[in-house]
UniProtKB/Swiss-Prot annotation:
Keywords tagged on the record: Phosphoprotein
Record-stated family: Belongs to the transposase 22 family.
Entry keyword annotation includes Phosphoprotein: yes
Native source organism of the sequence: Mus musculus
Residues modified as Phosphoserine: S136, S407, S409, S442, S478, S490, S559, S567
Protein name per Swiss-Prot or TrEMBL: LINE-1 type transposase domain-containing protein 1
Amino acid sequence: MSGVQSKAARLQKERKEKLSADRERKTATSLCLKHSEVPASMMKQFNALMEMQEVMFAEMRETYKNDIKEMLLKRTAPWVKHLEERIGQQEGDAISERPKPGEKVEELSSGTDEDTENLTVRSKKGKQDKAKPLNSSHVLKSSLERGGEALRGEHGRCGESSSLVDWKNANEKPAREASCQSEENRLKAPKESPPEGGAGATLRLAADFSAATLDVGRQWSQVFRLLKEKELEPELQCSVKLAFKCDGEANVFSDLHSLRQFTSRKPFLRELLKDVFPQNEGGRRNELRERLGKTLGDTKHEARRIASDSLSFLFIKEVEVASPEVKTYKEETLDRKNKGTLKKQEGEEEEISETQGEETSEGETSELGEEEGSESEEEEESSESEEEEESSESAEEIGFISLVVDSESEEEVNRKTASQTKKKETFHGLKELAFSYLVWDSKKKKLVRCQEGGAAAASTQRIGMPCLTLYLTSPSESLGAGSDGPKSHSCTKLSALSQVTPLLTNIEKGRYKVPQTEEPTAKEADLILETEENFKRGVISVIRQMQREVDKIKNIYVSDVLNMKSSLDDLNSLACTIEARVSEQEDAVEGLTKDTMQLAREIVDKERLREREDRFRSSNIRVIGIPEKENRENGAVDIIKEVIEENFAELEDQSLEIVSAHRVPNSVDEHRLTPRHILVKFGSASDKQRVLKASRAKQEITYRGSKIRLTADLSPGTIDARSQWCGIIKILQDEGFQPRILYPAKLAFDFKGKTKIFFDIEEFKKFISDIPYLKDLLNNIH
């Protein structure tokens, strides 16, 4: 078992590593472009594909894990761990809550399972020489120990406890009697009245199917109940198909989809079953499970979930077993040695599979377990002549099983007998197999073996005591019978069924004993190897499919990617060109900025020079209009004194100081039409201002009868700036606005009793635009 688990763990680890390596390789090949170059839509599709791959791998892992768990659970009792965990608690509860002899124990109805006995079906495939003979008492003890453990676990969950019977030691008779009395009370607890005379016992026979079969058949539970209430004679076949009669015609359905299609044409059935059909079916997970042929009900926890639903009544029947004419186990063994008619059964029962039951909180269906052994070494020695018959019949597979249960009350005996006869006619010559089972004898206070077989069983049963009859056939006969018509029955997929052992579970007084597990056989090893190979092939196929899908996506988008790549190259080249141009413009702007700054600095420097020059010339006056010949005869200083005496007599008393006077420029230009200016420098700026003020007051200034003009000596820049106001000053002066120039080149004039000052012509034009009178006067000035 540890070898199988280690193989499964190693296989899972290798698979994860392989998936990780393949994913990295695919990612490296598919994402050849940078993330920034791939459009968002492609990345979303690729991410969605990777998520789908992850989901698919996860579902495959769960599916294969369930397969391996199912295979391992067949070799190990699923209730072993639960028994070990609850040993301490349940032993104390069993001792403290053990009922007294004769006390009636109340049972809690779970709806699906009430102290049932598991009918274990296993196939006998090994030959006689491979069987391992075991002592008959050991086989009985082991079987009873298993049944006792399962029943004890069930009572522990329901809050009940019963006496324990130890079959290992024959000397503990008082303990056995107390346990037998408790067991008799437990069997009388169900709602059905006990059989008359107290000689019988109520058994529940449960067909043991795999968890996957129960998961598939669970969908029929409510449909079966509703059809049964309407007396439509539903029948659950072994292949989990639903059959019932409607309008006098038998109908067989294998799934709910076919039943839904049929009921859509029958208003009565559609109204009856409208609450049964599931509303939402499908989904990716169900689709994958159908493709892989697996279900999630094959695990131990899912098996518990299945057992908790209302499906159990389809496979479990309670029967009453008559016990007045039964024989003890020892007597039965001696009779089988002497009777030739029972030799065939003796050979078929050489290998008895022990039941392996799984505990659940609400009742459960048992897991199939097998333990090879014989009834006793003495029986094997006495049945050497029967081994040939057994070896020839052991290879025959049971193709069909039908459980025919008689009615549970005397009022339904006739109807059930007719129905049973009718069902037997549909079996197409199936074999009737004798079998034996253990029942509790309340009189003898012990378990006795009861053997029934075909017609003999019917003769030994009294009225009102139903018995179990098994019909077996080979696969070829069952296939032939199944092809006759709608009355045919389908074969179950249980592997090589050969025995049916109704076993009354006994309980043990001492500790729980965990049965020893056997090493995996060659067939199981081959099965494990085949499972691993199938897993590898499935993973490889999925990876190849994903690779094909990725290649397909790459082929679809490769042209678009190439176009986008070329477009990106063009955009990159264009961006480079634009970047170069922008760089050039930035360089030009930087150069212009530098030039602007240089010009600004030059302007500032010029302003500073102009201001200095104007300050240096602040005490100078220019005399304009004196002819050149006058300069030769008289000096410039004398000319200025003569002008002051002639025009400004009031200034003679103020003692104006004339520092210097000369014509500018120094050189004489023969082509010059006007005479050169005489530059007069006074001792102070105040003297200059008194002379200019007197010249403004006297409108006309002359020198020896010729008209001259006196102005302040300014720098060339200041003179150019003031020259823009010449035309405006003339017009304003004619209109009487008294215009004047303020230093360095500002226009000032009186308007409506206020002095208006303007720094440039644009500001002056904006002002006169709101005054129509001035606007009309200055319209011609640009």
